[in-house]
Amino acid sequence: MRKFILPLIASLAFATPALANDTRVEVRGGAIWSNGTTKATYGAAAGVDFDLAPMTFAGGEVSADKIDQSGTKLAYGATGRFGVKAGPLTKVFVAGGYTTEPCDLCEGSWHAGAGVEQSIMGPLYLKAEYRHFFTGSGIPDSNSVVGGVGMRF
């Protein structure tokens, strides 16, 4: 799967920023839980959003996240999102995509979730997001909640 994710990351990174209404980068951290176990998680993401209409947008992001546990590695993700502007400073969205395996014995998984971004000062924003990971292959699904801070360009 890495053969597909890395070219996608590169293509988004080199996409013409002038076409984007909202290019952003963020750092985030939170918790991920599965099967009665909760661990910390942290990472970073970069993405672009495009206005579809005055109050709706769609976009995509690439990410790298790490579960704070020995034996895990960076999990890379590609996510699409669609949302509404709930005012001049707030975005509410649903998201879905794919995340690579977070450990050598794990598998990559599809994910879906929802979140909110709130502008706080100039280009800075705060973000909260929930994701459900559809793990499959007899491995219990997992869930995460993260908060982050980002900057729009």
Spans of model-derived segments:
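Cleavable N-terminal export/targeting peptides
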Residues: 1-24
